Regions:
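Zn-dependent metallo-beta-lactamase
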Residues: 1, 16, 171-174, 198, ...
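C-terminal regulatory/interaction regions
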Residues: 190-220
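Short, small-residue-biased leader/transition segments that mark boundaries at the very start
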Residues: 2-7
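Short, contiguous clusters of charged residues that form electrostatic/catalytic patches at enzyme active sites
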Residues: 9-12, 136
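Metal-dependent nuclease catalytic regions and adjoining charged, substrate-binding loops involved
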Residues: 172, 179-192, 199-201
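Metallo-beta-lactamase
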Residues: 91-98, 102-183
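Active-site HxH/HxHxD metal-binding segment of metal-dependent hydrolases
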Residues: 11-86, 181-184
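Generic beta-strand structural signal
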Residues: 1, 86-87, 108
């Protein structure tokens, strides 16, 4: 994710084999998660770039506008709910969680879940859905967590710096309570203090709407 010379940072600090080939797995289309792609492509090591089809147009629009890159340059592959991405001997499972963007996904890997911005990093910025339409995907996400193993306390590796420590499944439960409470009207909607917009919170879970309606029911 992110900006700058991503490949150099990965090569120097992450890769155990500095000459390894790379696959890029995108959780969604937003610039702060995709604008490091050209740095990776310049390495000549990228085999494939994975993204959900509902976010593909936004990705390609940004890549073409800022870097002149096409789907062929990115070696683009679509992924959807239920897919498995194989990287060497490792496998990551794809689960759709639309809301932050229409094509937001999370990746299950062993005891970890890479969530991007699908459930926020303490603050969930809802860009393309009200809570009413976000809830089914969030419930699906929780069901997938429980389906795999109720005894595993997954670490949720989120996409932003506000909280550097991993979240647990408890955070996901709090987000579910928050979304359901907003829809029912049990949890009040206020105003965000960091920038213009509307906000609601429950324990460590918060939802922020910069411009979309918060809840279709509550806006009627």
């Amino acid at each position: 994710r992110g900006l700058g010379d991503v490949y150099k940072r990965q090569r120097e600090n992450v890769l155990t084999n500095p000459d390894a080939e790379l696959d890029i797995l995108l959780t969604h289309k937003h610039g702060d998660h995709i604008l490091g792609i050209p740095s990776l492509l310049k390495s000549g090591k990228v085999r494939r770039t994975y993204i959900h089809p509902d976010d593909q147009e936004g990705l390609l629009s940004s890549m073409q506008k800022f870097f002149g890159l096409t789907a062929e340059d990115l070696k683009l592959v679509n992924i959807v709910d239920g897919d498995t991405v194989r990287i060497g001997s490792e496998e990551l499972e794809v689960v759709d969680v639309p809301g932050h963007t229409k094509g937001s996904v999370v990746f299950f890997y062993k005891d970890y879940i890479f969530t991007g911005d699908a459930v926020g990093s303490g603050d969930l910025f809802m860009m393309e859905a009200a809570t009413d339409t976000y809830l089914p995907g969030l419930e699906h996400f929780m069901a997938e967590v429980l389906l795999r193993n109720e005894d595993v306390d997954y670490e949720l590796l989120t996409g932003h710096w506000e909280n550097l420590n991993p979240f647990s499944v408890e955070y996901l439960r709090h987000m579910l309570i928050l979304v359901k409470g907003v829809i029912r009207g049990d949890i009040p909607i206020g105003y965000y203090t960091r920038k213009p917009g509307r906000w609601a919170g429950y324990l460590d879970a918060n939802i922020f709407y910069p411009y979309a309606v918060f809840s279709y029911e509550n806006e009627k």
